[in-house]
Amino acid sequence: MATPRGQTVWFGNEFPNDDLKDLFRRLHQHSKDRRFRLLSVFLDESTAILKEEVANLPQQLQELVPHFDTACTLPEVDFRQGPLGAAMESALLTILELGMLIGNYEAEDIEWDLDPSQTILAGLSIGIIAGAAVALSSSLADVAKVGAESVRVSFRLGVYVADISTKLEAPQSDGTLQSWAHVVTGMSHEAVQEELSQFNAVTQNPEITKVFVSAADKTSVSVTGPPSRIKAAFQHSPSLRYSKSLPLPVYDGLCHAPHLYSQDDIEIVINSAKSVIPTSRPVRLPLISSQTGKPFEAKTAGELFLEIGTELLTGTIYLDNVTAGILEHVKLKEPTGNYQIISFRMSQVLNGIQAAIETDFPALGRARRDLVSWVHGDYGARRPSSYAASKLAIVGMACRLPGGANDPELFWELLEQGRDTLTTVPPDRFDLNTHYDPTGKTENATQTPFGNFIDRPGYFDAGFFNMSPREAEQTDPMHRLALVTAYEAMEMAGLVPGRTPSTRPNRIGTFYGQASDDWRELNASQNISTYAVPGGERAFANGRINYFFKFSGPSYNIDTACSSGLAAVQAACSALWAGEADTVIAGGLNIITDPDNYAGLGNGHFLSKTGQCKVWDKDADGYCRADGIGSVVIKRLEDAEADNDNILAVVLGARTNHSAEAVSITHPHAGAQKANYRQVLHQAGVNPLDVSYVELHGTGTQAGDAVESESVSDVFAPSMPRRRPDQRLYLGAVKSNIGHGEAAAGIASLLKALLVYQKNMIPKHIGIKTEINPIIPKDLDRRHVGLAMSNTPWPRPAGKKRLAVVNSFGAHGGNTTVLLEDAPERVKVSTQDDRTTHPVVISAKSKKSLQANIEKLLSWLDQNPDADLADLSYTLCARRMHHSMRFGAAASDIAALQKTLRSWLDSPKASTELRAIPNDAPSVVLTFTGQGAYYSGMGRELFAEFSYFRTQVLQLDQIAQRLGFPSVVPVIDGSIDDGPASPILTQLSVVVLEIALARFWSHLGIRISAVVGHSLGEYAAFAVAGVISAADALYLVGRRAQLTEERCTQGSHSMLSVRASEDDIEELIAGSPDTAEIAYEVCCRNTPQDTVIGGTKESIDRIRQALEANSIKCTQLDVPFAFHTAQMDPILDSLETLATPIAFKAPSIPVLSPLLGSVVFDRKSIHAQYLRRATREAVDFVAAIEAAQDFGLVDAKTIWIDVGPHPICAGLVRGIDSSASVISSCRRNEDNLATMSKSLVTLHLAGLTPCWAEYFRPREREYSLLKLPTYSWNETDYWIPYIGTWTLDKALLKYGEKKAPLSLAMSRPSALRTSLVHQITAETVEATTATLHVLSDMQHPDFLEALHGHRMNNCGVATSSIWSDMAFTVGEYLYRRLVPQVKDVHMNLSDFEVLHAQVALEKKGSVQPLVLKAHLDLSTSSMSLTWFNASAETGECAAESFATGVVRFEDPAAWTREWDRLSHLVLGRIEALEQRAAEGKASKLSKPLAYALFKNVVDYADRYRGMDQVVLHEHEAVAEVTLVAERHGTWHTPPHWIDSVSHLAGLVMNGSDASNTRDYFYVTPGCSSFRLLNPLKAGGKYRSYVRMFPLLEEANMYAGDVYILQGEQIVGMVGQIRFRRVPRLLMDRFFSPAAASHAEKQLQETAPSATSVKKSTPPAAEAPASVPALLSNPVAIPFPAASKSEVSTPPLTPPSQQESPGESAVITPATSDRGDPVDAGVVGQCLQVMARETGLEVDALTPDASFVQLGIDSLMSLVLSEKFRAELGIEIKSSLFLECPTIGEMTAWLEEYC
């Protein structure tokens, strides 16, 4: 159709028939897109005008208007109701029509086409006001501005009309709307007027309330007046009563009433408020009056609005006149042209006008343009007009949730399987046996035992997060797991800080919800330490994340009770919408440990006493508490798409409000919840019926379920309009599965919703255990809404997006709601990937983690054999944070990668030789090759793949061409054949390639430390170093090549590479008569054994023959000229002349000069004459490299990058230094990208992390971010158990009661009780693991008797046989708990270690508790054991264990096979000993004599004296043993029996004449294993044999195996029992009651810990007596590797610290991993203090370890400074830890100044 020659724009007085709410929602949505900037401006201006007008209303009217952020949300309420109905309707109609017009132009991208000569505007009633805005505009931007004034006038007119009209007739009391106008058809205007006049006269109707005609045309008449008067008029007049009439939707008053309004009224409406536009603004387009049918005569805006106001208030509408006016406009145009009507849908009036046009102008072409239909169009991804207009993308998530849901996939498995994670409170939280009272009579006790708990809450990788063990232990576990899940969520998101603009660290913020402080208030408060505040205060939860990752965006910790987690997400979203951050990490945190909170919530009737949250169940009786940690990563959607992220779901809106009107602060309120839903829906412009899934808050309380079911159903599934059957709304409640995570509840709900999107399934609801709660609305099914009672598919409709809502409500009254939709459908770009080789890098912060990461990846590859190697490379390189322990490879396919990974894992050297990258990145030197490496296509793949490299080449090529030289691009991209080329092309292409390569390396993030060029390569090196410009370099190279071609003869001279030194060549040539006179020149000294010589071709050929005759390898160089020889003389003057005008500058990068044999830093060394000399003189590459070494610019770690077509210089560097690290940029006959991949991996492994983002940028849209396994944490358990019952005891204080001292006799009965094991305090049994904590009192009569059966220095000292019996007792108990059907349990007590022996207290009636902790894992068939002293007051464990061991559950058949192979050897030695005794060569000792010798060190009680006779020779002995018949207590294996069969080794060491027993005594620090084939029998007869020998690797230490025999069979063995030689003068110190506590205190302050995990300890003065592990019992505990101390000399305590000889402490020097003692001077003492205070081993304090890596922060620096002063008398400032950032620098300072 031809272009219209005329057009009418029609502004009607009625809304289109479309869903009005939907129209405004869509307007709102489009306004957020920057493609609709003017629409957004118009709506913002209109909203502002309306807010201003509402604010000017009387208070009672203001209160009728709901809050609105945009006028587009006002239609969501019934705006026609109330006194402001007319005003709202008028304003909204104006907004809709103008908004639709503006949006139409922007959507279709139409130029402003309303030409005044071709266009006329027309409309009715309020529509004319909208038309006025267009009439006053000359552009679309004008409409957006002027339109706001039209909105103002419309609103004011409506307010005024309603105000006047209500004075004429009051509204209906029930709110029913009544029409003020009826339309009559079939009667003429005159007939209707006559009937009305008669009615008004007869009824004496006052003038102001009369019924009158407001509009008329040929077929209809509008009758207007007060509703009751209209009704009366129709009843009065039979003609009217029986006419065809209909009420019009005019509900708010009278217009078109000249008898009612005057000019003053019009002035009040139009001019009483300041116009938003100048009143003088000219009228641009004709606007037809609905009264006259002619254009308004007004010339300005002020006049126009007055005329319109006059017409609307006092004028009658004559539609015939309007039609005539439009027909007149049509008539003036081409009668046979085209005419267009532009309107907002069609109406009856418009149909009539169009019919009139068709009748009068039948030949006229007609067109229609609808201004509404565009709003339903899809214009692709939104381009937000502002931050606030953005949708948000959730791109990563991680969790630790109950039931082992330690990652999202495990969480989904739990949901999909419908599992319930309910359990009772684990013993590691608190003891239910003491803290649970269902009757509620015990104060501070919980009335419910139930909860939902995460696995291993204390486990944490402290080293990864640069925290010392001491700091980690004091840090709240939820803070630790916030760090961990934040990292894992970032891993899933592929978030590498700084990779993209949206991930800059200063634009990343953290928001976490937390509502309790259990750890700070309970666990950590048992021993408040340095890290109490940063470890426990809430703000540090997310502050620590910001600090560790160096995020400087906002950091908020939010407490809104149960909704804290989702409120934190909402706050994070608000920060994104406000532009305060570009990426946020948000979540919720809850770890339960404190029974006080259980008691408080129970007493507040929040908690269920019967178990899990029973959401919507009729028996719902409260919620069940739960742990939970969750983190999500959120960005703006456009940023996520730009960053190539995987989008889990999109956030459309999020809001929080408060239930202010609830009946109590903790009671929910349906009205507040509904208001919040509507705010979120309004924010997003979403129809609530389009939401198909709601994740309920759903706590399972009667009040909560009732209120939420009401609010959700009323908003999302109202009775009217009702959902269609295909619009079913599904509901879910995750608390039915995992309980109520309180501060983490909201984030758990969000994670579930995200998984529902990912899995396209709604998991079944398991909360209804009996039947649905009758308080739930009964008609839900009719409304098509309900819980998903089975796993329900939730497919994504084609081309559409699913909407979901997540609720979370706080007990304090807060309501948070988040609205989600599907991620945009992503179509992966599919093109041919030219990269045949891909880099793959994996990293970790520890060797263990790296190995596990590789194993995880291998497993993932096995499960995903179709994985794309390119995607894997992209994910691991560009989308991962990289750490210090690294693996890397370049692979061509998945199979090759798998082979490489397995090979690395299988290699014994892989782990032992693995080293962390250095803290300081190695230096990088670029070596620029000469022209000898030229070939066509030498940069082909790089040129094709990388736009940056290509741009550099093209720019340099353009310079070269402008200098008059040929293009080098064909050489680089390989578009010319490889073959001979001119020197100009050859040399220019090499230099262009090298400059481009150097810049490309910098582009990839490689920082260059120095450059060196070889021959021609020097020009490229100078350009890269900034000595000369790139243009100058190309000019000089090109002109030099031209001069060479012009003045030198090709082929007359040649160059020869000789594998020999310059001196060797000279000697060989001069020494032969045939060659002595031949002239040649040295061109290059490449390496000490690689020299290039040059000369005439004839001379060089003869020399080559002579050298090869002497077996010297020679290679003829393929060059046309002999550079650096006399052949270059003809060009030297001209070259110098050409270079003289060039500006030579000081290098920005040091230049290694082969000419000068030095490093150039200044601007004077390189000049025109330098280039002359460099052309003529030899290239001394060796001298350049050696100069760099002398200057310290390069070292053994330096990386040398060969920048050239082929790695020639790399080979030269290796020839000079065989250990040098060299890599290539390009390599002949190898794909550039394969070469680059290998080189980048090498750089990465060396500690130079490339900018992987740039490497992958060219094809990023083709790659997908893979969901790979998460990081493998190197975890340690940092759990501080709550000891005792003090949360209960404090309740007694108000009664004046005090807690009695710890007494095991008062404790409840225990399931396991023996003479040594007295009370189980904690027990957890799962499928394959079990944990047990037992409490024992060494003052218990049986225990005390066992101690006094082994006396040293008149003290009862615990023998290792005591610990052996405890180990076997606990081991068999736990094993049978897991494997109840087992018949016999065979145990090997192995790796037994001890730090401090236990000495019995002498004070009668005292308590001396100890704690044994055991953890059995069936997967390893082992059980770990740790013994602790405990406080006599509280039962709290000491800071460090005094003994550890491992019980291994083994096959006795294997023992028998082992011992059978050895028995003949043992029996042979026994026979030899007995023969020696018979010969008088060995001592034969009776029982009294043997134990008399033993008494030299230890005095055994009678029951321990089982050896009947002993044959002893030097350090070898055999004993006949008879066990006493009595067990003397309840044991697994009585300690006195164990000692009897094994303490022969102690007699050998302390009774043999081969030992120096006068000056020393010998004690055992332990053994490697202890096994008994069968239980020892009362009265049983055995033989023991042992041979002790000195350990060469450890001075003063002896070891041996004790064999236990019955008859000829070995039935037991103590493997590698060790004895240490100790000066006898220390006997009193270690084994006396008075000194025991003092020695313990001293050793706790100086000795290294047996474990890096230090537990809280009571004050030292209250510690139980214990001494170092210097025991004589045969089965004791060896020192750990870090504590192989030899106490053979008096203490090395500084005199200033010695109080008296009798009180001097023994300082046990720690040893390094090589077994060498750590320096016992100041440095050693300082290291000991540092190890003790941080909880680290001394071995960890290596010289290269940094304080940051060790977790020594500013707070710990202050502590250490104070400890150095107080204990060592050393005054240092805490700032020293900043000035000396590593251990090595610190120790160097101490050695220098202390």
From Swiss-Prot:
Outline the segment boundaries, as ranges, of region: C-terminal hotdog fold: 1482-1628
Its EC number is 2.3.1.-
The UniProt record lists the Carrier domain at: 1717-1794
Q: Where is this region: Product template (PT) domain?
A: 1314-1633
Q: Where is this region: N-terminal hotdog fold?
A: 1318-1454
Q: Where is the composition biased (Polar residues)?
A: 1644-1655, 1685-1701
Offer one Pfam family short name for this entry. Answer: ketoacyl-synt
- The yes or no answer to whether the keyword Acyltransferase is present is yes
List, alphabetically, the InterPro entries matched.
Answer: Ac_transferase_dom_sf (IPR001227), ACP-like_sf (IPR036736), Acyl_transferase_dom (IPR014043), Acyl_Trfase/lysoPLipase (IPR016035), Ketoacyl_synth_AS (IPR018201), Ketoacyl_synth_C (IPR014031), Ketoacyl_synth_N (IPR014030), Malonyl_transacylase_ACP-bd (IPR016036)
Where along the chain is composition biased (Basic and acidic residues)? 428-440
PANTHER family the UniProt entry points to = FATTY ACID SYNTHASE, NON-REDUCING POLYKETIDE SYNTHASE APTA-RELATED
Say which species the protein is native to. Neosartorya fischeri (strain ATCC 1020 / DSM 3700 / CBS 544.65 / FGSC A1164 / JCM 1740 / NRRL 181 / WB 181)
Q: Which residues form the PKS/mFAS DH domain?
A: 1318-1628
For the region Malonyl-CoA:ACP transacylase (MAT) domain, give the residue spans.
928-1249
Q: Which residues carry this modification: O-(pantetheine 4'-phosphoryl)serine?
A: S1754
Tell me what this protein is called. Non-reducing polyketide synthase nscA
